[in-house]
Design a protein with these regions (language model features):
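Extended, hydrophobic interaction surfaces within ordered domains
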Residues: 22-46, 255-281
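Tandem amphipathic alpha-helical repeat scaffolds
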Residues: 73-82, 120-135, 161-176, 203-218, ...
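Flexible inter-repeat linkers and adjacent short helices
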Residues: 1-167, 171-172, 325-329, 359-362, ...
Length: 391
């Protein structure tokens, strides 16, 4: 691998810069079995065989039994961020296979704390996986995380971090950006204490990604764009999904002001994802496509060419409103209200447009209030603009 990477222009010094380590550390990676930092091993495989995901999966699987306890901990995080959950299962099995007899040996080596932390990380990462693969609703995820948080009082830093990240994502998925921001500020000092810089950087990337959403929804568009470009231009960031999110969010920041720029950035996000290699990236692609379709519907671009099958139910109602088919829109939104027990900020806005008149005005006012309560001062402009017609 080392020789092939060199022939492709990735000398040990260049890899050292990319990995943010010394070139002697990179030399030792290739000279000592099992010496690799797991993140750097995965990145080196991607540089070695960029178009062969099965090759990379095969070698990660082969290396898993040889990983140190610290690398097993890092592997849980890295594979979660890549969305490679079958490989993460292999890592989890390796962690869970530690018997009491082995634990006694590890105590003598001074590894018992890391072994214990790894065992406790497994259920926390399993919960993150449910969210990433869309096998749990935002409400169910929130309730599950809340219950875990109350029942498990963690004190070890890594466990606290993943537990709080689960909590942040639970508020994030419900659109409560005020709580997201509060927990981010609480968590940052803990993350900065992590000694393993690749693990620390991965956690910080998660925080950066969520901060983009917070800044965007607080209508701090320049700040949001700056963070996006930090993620995009970070040479040490090898996560496809975070770069895709960053491009999409730059595009989203232009949703109301510049249709063409918004469209170009969102299409760049789709290019980064390419043909999704796992379920997490499939879902990421669906979300980008949905945002792109929202952009087209909002600006009324080629509405009759939009495939209804590509839209989720709420956006279908938005399209029907723009096409003047208000009754269809109302029917969809009433079904959503019956299923979920409430309408989201966006759905209240769509209902306001569809119903019209004084009743429509009330829905628009509820939408504005809902956006305000959740701390979304970017999309609040939707009901605000619509309400101007009533003045």
């Amino acid at each position: 691998m080392n020789e092939k990477l060199k022939s492709n222009g990735y000398t040990n010094r260049k890899l050292a810069k990319r990995f943010d380590v010394t070139h002697t550390t990179v030399n030792s990676y290739f000279n000592t079995k099992g010496k690799f930092d797991f993140m750097h091993f995965v990145d080196a495989l991607r540089l070695y065989k960029p178009n062969d995901v099965e090759f990379r999966r095969k070698w990660i699987k082969k290396m898993t039994p040889h990983l140190s306890h610290k690398n097993l901990k890092l592997a849980l995080e890295v594979l979660d961020m890549f969305g490679e959950y079958e490989l993460q299962d292999v890592v989890m099995q390796q962690i869970m296979s530690l018997t009491n007899e082995k634990n006694e040996k590890e105590k003598k080596k001074g590894n018992s704390k890391t072994v214990r932390i790894n065992l406790n990380l497994v259920p926390l990462y399993k919960t993150l996986r449910e969210r990433s693969e869309n096998t749990i609703t935002p409400k169910m995820f929130f309730e599950k995380v809340d219950k875990m948080r109350k029942n498990q009082k963690h004190t070890d830093n890594e466990l606290v971090i993943i537990s709080v990240l689960n909590t942040i994502y639970s508020f994030f998925d419900l659109g409560n950006y005020k709580m997201v921001n509060e927990y981010i500020q609480q968590l940052l000092p803990d993350i900065l204490e992590i000694k393993c810089h690749t693990l620390r950087d991965s956690f910080l990337l998660r925080i950066k990604e969520m901060t983009i959403f917070v800044e965007l929804h607080e209508n701090n568009l320049d700040k949001a764009r700056d963070i996006c470009f930090e993620i995009i231009n970070d040479e040490t960031n090898c996560y496809v999904s975070t770069k895709a999110v960053a491009y999409c969010k730059v595009g989203e920041s232009f949703v109301f002001s510049d249709y063409q720029r918004a469209k170009e950035y969102m299409e760049k996000s789709l290019d980064i994802i390419g043909n999704p290699v796992n379920r997490k990236l499939e879902i990421r692609r669906e979300k980008v496509l949905n945002t792109l379709l929202f952009l087209r519907i909002h600006h009324e671009k080629d509405l009759h060419t939009i495939n209804l099958e590509e839209l989720d139910e709420a956006e279908k109602s938005f399209l029907y409103v723009k096409l003047g088919e208000n009754e269809k829109a109302i029917k969809i939104l009433q079904t959503l209200q019956n299923e979920n027990g409430y309408l989201s900020s966006f759905q209240l806005y769509y209902m306001g447009l569809a119903v019209g008149g004084e009743e429509g005005k009330r829905y628009l006012e509820m939408s504005e209030e809902s956006f305000s309560k959740s701390g979304d001062f970017f999309y609040i402009s939707l009901p605000k603009e619509a309400l101007k017609c009533y003045n």
